[in-house]
């Protein structure tokens, strides 16, 4: 492929991002994220690892049936059954890709694969040829490429290009590289690889040294024209390269890179909020682009400069990345059509009239408690309602909390398990402890609480509380979320949400070795 100034954005939030502890998503949640990614304008959506479990296959297949503009991709090991499952999963998509990989570093080949270099090349070529039976768009990844020998990489990349690979991905699997080395590595590898100019070269950088974005940009300087990234930099260990940071770096410093993307940057913040809400991973306030403080100025000198001319201290506008200037949304007199229109403006799509009616009913309840409804309220409300509808195993109905100074708080809670109403009571060292003990007295999940957190959705004492609960049982870790103006109600909802996800994840065991790149 000839050098171009167009950068392909490959989003792997639904695959590599979901491998963050507790970030597992239901099929319905993945579809919501995929729709938002398409609205964001990403070129490729890596929808999952189809062979990992029946649940993963179902989610990839559902996304393939839903997405029409972006290419839908499934990851697969260089194993025939994996590749065929990936091909079947993405088959309904108008634009489809299979992404297959094998490790290429000496340490991985010797200790993990227990294969000789020649055997690795043969497996890679076979994998690409099988993938080409399903689609002309085949990506091949050299796992742990940045710790691989460059001459061997050139050999294996040349072989898979001849076999039909159209994109070659070079992952920094353990976040080991530094930017100037990354640029040199890409430049040398592309030059050494037979037919290296006929394919798209891709970078997939992990953030173990905090350099994922810098390394991705360096790879582009070295000749890559695809970057693999996630919303909010979500990913296992220290995370992946952040899509919002890469895109805005290319846009703001167009003078240095001269590169373009197809991203609608006004959808960056809505995408960030959706992924954060669904996964339960909050965005740190000082996170570039999407953090709450990203466009805040405390210094009097800075404030004065910004008031006189924004560009004195801002290199991009808040509006350009999707921060709304007027966040006041709706009130108690707002009707259903206004509510529906506002959701559309926020990029929130509900799948059915039933879902819209349920969300509108929740909105009316909230409007009776809260005078001003902001965009953030609607995001939290809809996510909470959708979570309740989709995770049917455990559902909150009502609760009563009794507290008195010097006495143990008591929680009386009513909830349902698969439609069957349950009642439970318990005392605890505090109201939260009492709620969890009451639920567990019936659920008997055996899960351990790892994290409990509450965040105010907006400012003011009337704000909704958005609660996150992380539960662990065995090797399964899940996050549950709940939102309500009563933080104790939100707490119960979050715990029940986590239990539902725990049951869901237990029903879809992962394939052994389904790993990462």
Curated annotation (Swiss-Prot):
Protein's pathway: Amino-acid biosynthesis; L-leucine biosynthesis; L-leucine from 3-methyl-2-oxobutanoate: step 1/4
Reactions that this protein is recorded to catalyse: 3-methyl-2-oxobutanoate + acetyl-CoA + H2O = (2S)-2-isopropylmalate + CoA + H(+)
Subcellular location: Cytoplasm
Listed Gene3D superfamilies: 1.10.238.260, 3.30.160.270, Aldolase class I
Keywords: Amino-acid biosynthesis, Branched-chain amino acid biosynthesis, Cytoplasm, Leucine biosynthesis, Manganese, Metal-binding, Transferase
CC cofactor: Mn(2+)
Main location: cytoplasm
Keyword Transferase in record: yes
Lineage: superkingdom: Bacteria
GO molecular function, one term: acetyl-CoA C-acetyltransferase activity
Mechanisms controlling activity: Inhibited by 3-bromo substituents and Leu, the pathway end product.
Enzyme class: transferase
GO cellular component entries: cytosol
Activity relative to temperature: Optimum temperature is 40 degrees Celsius. Thermostable up to 44 degrees Celsius, in the presence of Leu thermostable to 59 degrees Celsius, in the presence of Leu and 3-methyl-2-oxobutanoate or Leu and acetyl-CoA thermostable until 61-62 degrees Celsius.
Region (Required for the condensation reaction. Not required to bind substrate): 366-517
Domain Pyruvate carboxyltransferase: 7-269
pH profile of the protein: Optimum pH is 8.5.
Family: Belongs to the alpha-IPM synthase/homocitrate synthase family. LeuA type 1 subfamily.
Xref: HAMAP family: LeuA_type1
Assembly description: Homodimer. Remains a homodimer in the presence of L-leucine.
Name recorded for this polypeptide: 2-isopropylmalate synthase
Biological source species: Neisseria meningitidis serogroup B (strain ATCC BAA-335 / MC58)
Name of the coding gene: leuA
């Amino acid at each position: 492929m000839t050098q171009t100034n167009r950068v392909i954005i490959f989003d792997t939030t639904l695959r590599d991002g979901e491998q963050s502890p507790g970030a597992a998503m239901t099929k319905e949640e993945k579809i919501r994220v995929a729709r938002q990614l398409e609205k964001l304008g990403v070129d490729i959506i890596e929808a999952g690892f189809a062979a990992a479990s029946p649940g993963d296959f179902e989610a990839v297949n559902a996304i393939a049936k839903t997405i029409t503009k972006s290419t839908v991709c499934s990851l697969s090991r260089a194993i025939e059954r994996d590749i065929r499952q990936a091909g079947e999963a993405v088959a309904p998509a108008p634009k489809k890709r299979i992404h297959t990989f094998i490790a290429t570093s000496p340490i991985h080949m010797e200790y993990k694969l227990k294969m000789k270099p020649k055997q690795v090349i043969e497996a890679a070529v076979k994998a690409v040829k099988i993938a080409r039976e399903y689609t002309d768009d085949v990506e091949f990844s050299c796992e742990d490429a940045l710790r691989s020998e460059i001459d061997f990489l050139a050999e294996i990349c040349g072989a898979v290009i001849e076999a039909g690979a159209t994109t070659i991905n070079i992952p920094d699997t353990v976040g080991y590289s530094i930017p100037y080395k990354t640029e040199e590595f890409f430049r040398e590898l592309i030059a050494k690889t037979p037919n290296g100019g006929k394919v798209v070269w891709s970078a997939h950088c992990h953030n173990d040294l905090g350099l994922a974005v810098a390394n991705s940009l360096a790879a582009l300087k070295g000749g890559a024209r695809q970057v693999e990234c996630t919303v909010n930099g979500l990913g296992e260990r220290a995370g992946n390269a952040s899509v919002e940071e890469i895109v805005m770096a290319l846009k703001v410093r167009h003078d240095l890179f001269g590169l373009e993307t197809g991203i609608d940057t006004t959808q960056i913040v809505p995408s960030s909020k959706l992924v954060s809400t669904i996964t339960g991973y909050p965005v740190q306030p000082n996170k570039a682009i999407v953090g709450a403080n990203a466009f805040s100025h405390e210094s009097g000198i800075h404030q004065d400069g910004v008031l006189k001319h924004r560009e004195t201290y801002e290199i991009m506008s808040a509006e350009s990345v999707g921060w709304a200037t007027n966040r006041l949304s709706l009130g108690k007199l707002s009707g259903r059509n206004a509510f529906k229109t506002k959701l559309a403006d926020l990029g929130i799509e509900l799948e059915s009239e039933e879902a819209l009616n349920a969300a509108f009913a929740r909105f009316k309840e909230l409007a009776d408690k809260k005078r001003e409804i902001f965009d953030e309220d609607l995001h939290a409300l809809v996510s909470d309602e959708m979570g309740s509808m989709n995770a049917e195993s455990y559902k909150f109905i009502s609760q009563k909390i009794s507290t008195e100074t010097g006495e143990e708080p008591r929680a009386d809670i009513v909830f349902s398990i698969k439609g069957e109403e349950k009642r439970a009571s318990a005392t605890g060292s505090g109201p939260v402890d009492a709620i969890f003990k009451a639920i567990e007295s019936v659920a008997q999940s055996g899960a351990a609480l790892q994290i409990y957190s509450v965040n105010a959705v907006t400012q003011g004492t009337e704000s909704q509380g958005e609660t996150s609960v992380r539960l662990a049982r065995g090797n399964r870790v899940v996050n549950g979320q709940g939102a309500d103006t009563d933080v104790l109600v939100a707490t119960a909802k979050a715990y029940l949400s986590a239990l539902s996800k725990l049951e869901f994840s237990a029903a879809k065991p992962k394939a052994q070795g389904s790993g990462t790149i």
